[in-house]
Amino acid sequence: ISCDLIREGKGDVFIAGGSDSFSSLAFSGFHALHALDKNACSPFNHSTGITLGEGSGILVIESYEHAVERGAKIYCEILGSGVSSDAYHITAPRPDGEGQMSAIRRAVESSALSFDDIDYINAHGTGTAKNDEAEFLSLHTLFDGNNHLSVSSTKSMTGHCLGAAGSIEAVFSVKAIKENLVPPTIGYSDEDLKVLSEKAGNIDFIPNKSHTKDVHYAMSNSFAFGGNNASIIFSDNKHDIPDNSKNEKIYITGISKLTGTKTDEHSLNCNLTSEDYDKHGIKVAFCRKLDRFSQLQLLSGMDALADADIKIDKDNEYKTGIVIGTADGPMTEIVDFQKKAITRGTEKGSAFSFPNTVYNAAGGYLSIFS
């Protein structure tokens, strides 16, 4: 977003990043999902779950001309990025990795590069079996012809910092370019190294120890709940990236709203009925998975698509996106989950409701159903 705003002339300098602290809510939720490893995680290895961490990562993003004019130290250039949605499951990735690969392809294409150009990838690498298997498949599918690629998961050292993970790992990627030093995935035993050598193929997974390497192009990948995928590419040089903007006129072709309409004490609440769900073929069993925030988002989204006479299919699914605005998001779900964790204990959180406490769950449900 910062890059887009700079290219549109909306500003010269933007501060971008993320921060997250360790919380009982996150611990309780991931414990309920059986996603925590009792030992330190070692992604793409023997790990059976994540290790939670906390931290913050910030990047100052600036136009080249403005940076040169003020004599700024330049670490690298942001070449391009890509995003996608699995539209598959609220917590698990698509097993075939197609959603992840879509984001990676878009990042490479927007950077005017080829897959063979990438020198280092800071992988999402959480340490859970499903995530690691899907990402391992994605990497080998797309970069099979790249004989100089290094990949690591720095979550093995920092833990999964959740909302801060993407920005922290972006900093690792930038430092890899600046220092010509690629960070490792730690936690490999001698036996683990034997297994890795049999499955790694041409990819250097940097086990246990960092090493020097000329890194001209680095990629950082983040794949989140709801099937939200993002990939970004950094470069050590200034490049002329093709301007793909078409200056097209943009129109509104579909609208919808869900609001309270009564004038009594219920005026602030939307009165949803079975008819609201039935008209879109949404089954009650599916609705029960959703918190109120997600229900409203799903129904209003489906209403707008219907009003625009758009059906999502194989021909347009990769050209259709979702942008959602919210002030409080799933706050009710967050409070309810936290109250239960406090009264019952952090080890007795609900695996059913925890996914609904993340802000991108509503968009994830809409993408899955539509």
Give names to the regions the model predicted.
Residues 9-13:
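Alpha-to-beta junction loops
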Residues 2, 60:
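Conserved RecA-like P-loop NTPase ATPase core
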